[in-house]
A protein has these predicted regions:
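Conserved two-metal-ion catalytic palm core of "right-hand" nucleic acid polymerases
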Residues: 1-130
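Short, glycine/acidic-rich hinge or "gate" loops at secondary-structure transitions
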Residues: 23-27, 102-111, 155-166, 200-205
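A general structural signal for short secondary-structure junctions and capping/turn motifs
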Residues: 62-67, 163, 196-197
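Glycine- and acidic
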Residues: 71, 123-134, 168-174, 239
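An acidic- and aromatic-residue-enriched active-site/binding cleft used to recognize and process polar
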Residues: 78-81, 167-171, 176-179, 202-205, ...
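Amphipathic alpha-helical scaffolding segments
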Residues: 88-99, 145, 187-192, 207
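Active-site palm subdomain of RNA-directed nucleic acid polymerases
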Residues: 102, 137-168, 173-176, 181
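C-terminal polymerase-core module
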Residues: 182-239
Length: 239
């Protein structure tokens, strides 16, 4: 019942318009590219097939392209992303932190979403349910907000030569100066802490072999074995 209620709130005309504008704002910085927004197939392919195709083009293939412009790749993800998400940060993302803190009633969309998710979890403010497209969407709102805050932090540090690809809670940070990569990781960590999340130190790594690091091991092995199926992609990887 609460799930349906939440869907109804979000899809109301004015609320949906507000959320669409929100995502446009989050995507203003072209140096931080979120590629985990669900894709709707406009062809005969299923939505899932289109999503997989988009994943390859937007992450792995784009990473290979960026290897031509950047010398270092830093990778990390978020520890227990959904389980640690602070529900009040949903309201901060939708309304701004100052507005959400000053107006705490349910007249605001952000507060309505926050309250509904708390109700799903017996009043808990830490974590959101997993396993649904709706919760993936809610997570993207909060992580888009983090992208926006990270942009502000990076600008204050006057770092300009970088590119970030984010697939939900997985980050790939491309830089030419390794010090910039370390600084961006630190700034990301600081902004995540603000919403109750933490960088996963066990999965944080950096490499100067950008191409090899950009491709999953099983795929890398497949592409390096001679075959005629994907000659263009093989050539791009092996040159």
């Amino acid at each position: 019942v609460l799930y349906v209620y939440l869907v109804n709130i979000i899809t109301q005309k004015d609320n949906w318009s507000k959320i669409r504008k929100l995502f446009k704002r989050f995507q203003k910085n072209k140096k931080i590219n979120c590629v985990s927004i669900p894709v709707k197939s406009l062809t005969k392919k299923s939505d899932k097939a289109e999503q997989i195709s988009n994943w390859w083009k937007s992450i792995e293939q784009k990473s290979i392209e960026l290897a031509l412009d950047f010398d270092y790749l830093f990778e990390t993800d978020i520890s227990d992303c959904y389980g640690s998400l602070y529900t009040h940060s949903i309201a901060w993302a939708i309304e701004s932190k100052s507005v959400a803190k000053s107006i705490k009633n349910n007249s605001l969309l952000g507060n309505q979403v926050d309250s509904a998710i708390q109700s799903m979890q017996y009043g808990q403010t830490n974590g959101i349910p997993q396993g649904s497209v709706l919760m993936d969407f809610i997570a993207e709102i909060v992580l888009g907000y983090v992208d926006e805050q990270l942009t502000k932090s990076i600008n204050l540090e006057k770092i300009s030569n970088y590119q970030i690809i984010r697939y939900r809670d997985d980050y790939r940070i491309f830089v030419n100066n390794p010090n910039d990569g370390s600084k961006i990781l630190k700034l990301l960590s600081e902004n995540l802490i603000e919403i109750g999340m933490r960088v996963n130190n066990a999965k944080t790594k950096d490499s100067s072999d950008v191409i090899t690091s950009s491709i999953k091991a099983d795929k890398l092995e497949r592409y390096l074995i001679p075959t005629t199926k994907n000659p263009a992609q093989q050539y791009l990887i092996t040159i």
